[in-house]
């Protein structure tokens, strides 16, 4: 009996999941626990593992197609077995709320003759490896069959096109799917549905920089984690948020919900998007524990191992463009949060201290807040608190 | 719109039929018999005689199949072999004549030469005439290359045509050149009882194909009694003593023989065409053409052996049809990526695409799949279990880039390889393919499987 593999439900709110890549094709043998596909939903990308050893006997969801959780995406069984399709809608998983019952999927008939593509096996393999869109290819073989020459010519064209000055290049169309789609929707929703604005401040972190240099090697030796300026800033944010809970809040249903705890979202850039892993109860963590969590979460996120729970529920977010040399910027709120802090690139500059000019290290901070939840003065007070923590850093260590 | 075609060989007559089918008014000029070298002096007559040798071989081994023949029961009648050959040739020539008639192609016997771009002078038995044509296709073919110090005399120094119609089976024969033609003739006459000596300048026979194939073949040829001297060169000939004097390294050897067959290649037959008068570019290597078979003068086409290159009848058919179609307004181009190369020796050799050496030089670590006929049921039944099938697959995508075979009936098997390669199939597809059993085709299937490590009987 073939085993059905379904689109998993990653988080309560998940309505659709996309199969981004099939790592196996029909007919391939699979080992139990072997990765058979990558799926994407919201901001999560996840590998699907084979539940049983066997042969991948049928693929129901094509690459790039979105289906509700619980929908069968493929079947694993004996090589010569055929799939017994279940009648009706795919069965929802037990823990799936009724509201998100998956829509019944149409059983599409096998591709009709018209849809069938005339292409030689060699041409198909080369095109697929190079990621060429087969539909864009024109076949010059018998009866319009796409042959190897057509593919190699198209690849050469593509290369030539890329080598051309930008003005002569053809515009590229990239369909917005998966993570990009989620980011696009979230960011637009954020800007459309809130009254956000950004204020900036500069903190003199000369002392902090010295402290960080002193502590980091010891921290690494003792706890296995380097201490970075970001870690100190995060700690400062946690402390400042506790003193100014209006920025540690959600603006939801015409209510402002302030949180007693700080779940800190730390934005992590990925190759094809970004995720915001969440450090729960950051207020309970010491500086070193916070640093460890931040490092561990970022690593997991980059490796695509972050689970859906770890990417949800933040009460305040921090984003850092300092590594790219950006100083001040306007971060976009991660709704329903009402505050997000942007860390810029620190720089050394002469600063007056009394009549004396000294070399100081300056860290640019940008705070975006939702004016519906909080006015300028309390937001500035929060930033001021941050500045104070950063300029007198001894308190951060405690 | 008249299309004049010079030469009625495979390139010329195929072009004539194709053009006529496309509604053209076609004039075909040939100085000899229709069918050209292939039909009259090449492919067909040689293979016909070779078939006689094959039958003889079979009969000689009749006892191993359980058939007893009384002593002295076998005798070879060369003149009957000749007349059988002639019958086959005549029937095929008549076939071509019928095709000309059926397609209303005007055939003129004579020698053609250009007077200008569109004017041809035809000199025939009934005198001279001048014909005009809107387009001209040159398919004048090729002729054997002579050795300057030993020109063909038709008496003792022979070309391949002369050797086909000897009055008797020679008791001894020196063959200069161990390429395709030399090897086919060596096998023929050796199996009919001649003492054959091959003198080849390269370090092995059939230098164009892979070494493993050539070596296997040479062993077999030597078993048949042929003396093979590679890395050797004919120095001179002594006509009166009927002796060929040849060198291997610094040493000189003498071989006395009834005949010397010079088979060192063929050259385009362009003399007398007066190509200059039409402004057509050419060199001793042939007439350069583009992918539509057009010469530098766009309304003058050339194809077949006249353009040099592949020099195979089946390539000529293809070229002729492309030339005729393009001349008739169709935008077609030549595709000679997959031209089978057959050698009718015993055992036969058939190759297509790249040799292993070529494939390695282009793709580096190619996947090689081999299967031996000694593990094939049908080959054992036929008692022809010598040889192998070798397949070269490109390493990344598994494209079959070359097939080389030596063994029973491989000149027929190569058709399957041609279909596979022309269809751009990949090695892994062999898994989903069933070869009939017991057949020689199974070797091809097993060799394909072996490129992906899945051969069953190896």
From Swiss-Prot, chain A:
Gene Ontology biological process terms in this record: acetoin catabolic process
Domain Lipoyl-binding: 2-77
Active site location: 371, 375
Boundaries of every Peripheral subunit-binding (PSBD) domain copy: 118-155
Gene3D superfamilies listed in its UniProt record: 2.40.50.100, Chloramphenicol acetyltransferase-like domain, E3-binding domain
Catalytic activity as recorded in UniProt: N(6)-[(R)-dihydrolipoyl]-L-lysyl-[protein] + acetyl-CoA = N(6)-[(R)-S(8)-acetyldihydrolipoyl]-L-lysyl-[protein] + CoA
Keywords: Acetoin catabolism, Acyltransferase, Lipoyl, Transferase
Cofactor(s) this protein cannot do without: (R)-lipoate
Any GO molecular function: dihydrolipoyllysine-residue acetyltransferase activity
Presence of keyword Ribonucleoprotein: no
Keyword Methyltransferase listed: no
Enzyme Commission code: 2.3.1.12
Pathway: Ketone degradation; acetoin degradation
N6-lipoyllysine modifications at: 43
Cofactor note: Binds 1 lipoyl cofactor covalently.
InterPro entries linked to this entry: 2-oxoacid_DH_actylTfrase, 2-oxoacid_DH_E2_comp, Biotin_lipoyl, CAT-like_dom_sf, E3-bd_dom_sf, PSBD, Single_hybrid_motif
Membrane spanning residue stretches: none
CDD domains: lipoyl_domain (cd06849)
Family to which the UniProt record says this protein belongs: Belongs to the 2-oxoacid dehydrogenase family.
PANTHER family in the record: DIHYDROLIPOAMIDE ACETYLTRANSFERASE COMPONENT OF PYRUVATE DEHYDROGENASE COMPLEX, LIPOAMIDE ACYLTRANSFERASE COMPONENT OF BRANCHED-CHAIN ALPHA-KETO ACID DEHYDROGENASE COMPLEX, MITOCHONDRIAL
Protein's UniProt name: Dihydrolipoyllysine-residue acetyltransferase component of acetoin cleaving system
Lineage: Bacteria, Bacillati, Bacillota, Bacilli, Bacillales
Gene: acoC
UniProtKB/Swiss-Prot annotation, chain B:
Species of provenance: Bacillus subtilis (strain 168)
GO MF annotation list: dihydrolipoyl dehydrogenase (NADH) activity; flavin adenine dinucleotide binding
Protein name (Swiss-Prot/TrEMBL): Dihydrolipoyl dehydrogenase
Entry keyword set: Acetoin catabolism, Cytoplasm, Disulfide bond, FAD, Flavoprotein, NAD, Oxidoreductase, Redox-active center
Record has Transmembrane helix as a keyword: no
Residues engaged in binding FAD: 30-38, 47, 112, 305, 313
Catalyzed reactions: N(6)-[(R)-dihydrolipoyl]-L-lysyl-[protein] + NAD(+) = N(6)-[(R)-lipoyl]-L-lysyl-[protein] + NADH + H(+)
Cofactor(s) demanded: FAD
Subcellular location, record wording: Cytoplasm
Taxonomic superkingdom: Bacteria
GO BP annotations listed: 2-oxoglutarate metabolic process; acetoin catabolic process; pyruvate metabolic process
Misc remark: The active site is a redox-active disulfide bond.
PANTHER family: DIHYDROLIPOYL DEHYDROGENASE, DISULFIDE OXIDOREDUCTASE
Residues annotated for NAD(+) binding in this entry: 177-181, 200, 263-266
Pathway stated in the Swiss-Prot or TrEMBL entry: Ketone degradation; acetoin degradation
């Amino acid at each position: 009996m073939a085993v059905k593999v379904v689109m998993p439900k990653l988080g309560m709110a998940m309505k659709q999941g996309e199969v981004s890549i099939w790592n196996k094709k029909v007919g391939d043998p699979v080992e139990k626990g072997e990765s058979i596909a990558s799926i994407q939903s919201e901001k999560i990308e996840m590998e699907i593992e084979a539940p049983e050893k066997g042969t991948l006997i049928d693929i129901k969801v094509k690459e790039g197609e979105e289906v509700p959780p619980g929908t069968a995406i493929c079947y694993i069984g004996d090589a010569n077995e055929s799939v017994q399709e279940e009648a009706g809608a795919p069965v929802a998983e037990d823990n799936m709320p009724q509201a998100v019952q998956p829509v019944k999927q149409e059983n599409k008939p096998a591709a009709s003759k018209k849809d069938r593509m005339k292409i030689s096996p060699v041409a198909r393999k080369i095109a697929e490896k190079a990621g060429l869109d087969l539909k864009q290819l024109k076949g010059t073989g018998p009866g319009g069959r796409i042959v190897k020459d057509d593919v190699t010519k198209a690849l050469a064209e593509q290369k030539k096109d890329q080598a051309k000055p930008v003005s002569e290049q053809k515009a590229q169309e990239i369909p917005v799917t998966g993570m990009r789609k989620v980011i696009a929707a979230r960011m637009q929703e954020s800007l459309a549905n809130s009254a956000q604005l950004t204020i900036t401040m500069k903190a003199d972190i000369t002392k902090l920089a010295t402290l960080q240099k002193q502590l980091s090697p010891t921290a690494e030796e003792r706890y296995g984690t380097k201490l970075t300026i970001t870690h100190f800033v995060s700690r400062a944010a946690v402390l400042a948020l506790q003193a100014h809970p209006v920025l540690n809040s959600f603006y939801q249903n015409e209510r402002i919900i302030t949180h007693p705890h700080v779940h800190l979202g730390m934005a992590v850039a990925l190759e094809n998007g970004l995720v915001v892993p969440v450090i729960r109860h950051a207020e309970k963590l010491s500086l070193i524990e916070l640093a460890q969590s931040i490092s561990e979460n970022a690593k997991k996120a980059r490796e695509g191992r972050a689970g859906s729970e770890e990417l949800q529920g933040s009460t305040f977010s921090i984003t850092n463009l300092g590594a790219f040399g950006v100083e001040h910027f306007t971060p976009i709120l991660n709704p329903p949060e009402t505050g997000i802090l942007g860390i810029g690139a620190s720089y050394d500059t002469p600063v007056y201290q009394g009549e004396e000019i000294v070399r100081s290290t300056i860290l640019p901070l940008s705070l975006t807040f939702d004016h519906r939840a909080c006015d300028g003065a309390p937001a500035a007070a929060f930033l001021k608190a941050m500045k104070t923590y950063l300029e007198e850093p001894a308190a951060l260590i405690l | 719109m008249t299309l004049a075609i010079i030469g009625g060989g495979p390139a010329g007559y195929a072009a004539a039929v194709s053009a006529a089918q496309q509604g053209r008014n076609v004039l075909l000029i040939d100085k000899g018999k229709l069918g050209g070298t292939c039909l009259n002096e090449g492919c067909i007559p040689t293979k016909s005689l070779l078939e006689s040798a094959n039958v003889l071989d079979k009969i000689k081994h009749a006892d191993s199949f359980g058939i007893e023949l009384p002593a002295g029961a076998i005798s070879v009648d060369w003149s009957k072999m000749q007349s059988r050959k002639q019958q086959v040739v005549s029937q095929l020539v008549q076939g071509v004549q019928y095709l000309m008639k059926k397609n209303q192609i005007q055939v003129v016997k004579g020698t053609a030469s250009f007077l200008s771009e569109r004017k041809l002078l035809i000199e025939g038995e009934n005198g001279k005439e001048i014909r005009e044509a809107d387009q001209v296709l040159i398919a004048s073919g090729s002729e054997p290359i002579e050795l300057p110090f030993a020109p063909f005399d038709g008496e003792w120094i022979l070309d391949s045509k002369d050797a086909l119609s000897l009055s008797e089976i020679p008791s001894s024969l020196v063959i200069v050149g161990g390429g395709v033609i030399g090897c086919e003739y060596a096998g023929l006459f050796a199996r009919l009882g001649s003492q054959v000596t091959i003198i080849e300048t390269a370090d092995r026979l059939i230098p164009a194909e892979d070494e493993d194939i050539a070596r296997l073949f040479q062993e077999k040829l030597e078993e048949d009694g042929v003396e093979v001297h590679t890395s050797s060169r004919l120095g001179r000939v002594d006509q009166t003593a009927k002796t060929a004097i040849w060198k291997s390294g610094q040493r000189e050897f003498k071989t006395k023989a009834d005949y010397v067959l010079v088979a060192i290649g063929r050259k385009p037959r362009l003399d007398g065409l007066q190509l200059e008068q039409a402004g057509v570019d050419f060199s001793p290597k042939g007439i350069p053409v583009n992918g539509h078979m057009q010469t530098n003068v766009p309304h003058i086409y050339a194809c077949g052996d006249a353009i040099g290159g592949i020099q195979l009848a089946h390539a000529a058919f293809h070229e002729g049809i492309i030339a005729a179609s393009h001349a008739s307004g169709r935008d077609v181009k030549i595709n000679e990526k997959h031209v089978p190369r057959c050698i009718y020796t015993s055992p036969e050799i058939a190759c297509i695409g790249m040799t292993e050496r070529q494939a390695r030089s282009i793709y580096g670590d190619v996947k090689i799949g081999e299967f031996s006929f000694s593990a094939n049921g049908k080959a054992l039944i036929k008692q022809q279990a010598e040889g192998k099938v070798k397949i070269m697959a490109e390493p990344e995508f598994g494209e079959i880039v070359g097939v080389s075979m030596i063994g029973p009936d491989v000149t027929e098997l190569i058709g399957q390889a041609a279909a596979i390669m022309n269809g751009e199939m990949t090695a892994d597809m062999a898994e989903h393919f069933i070869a009939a059993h017991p057949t020689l085709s199974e070797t091809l299937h097993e060799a394909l499987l072996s490129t992906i490590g899945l051969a069953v009987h190896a």
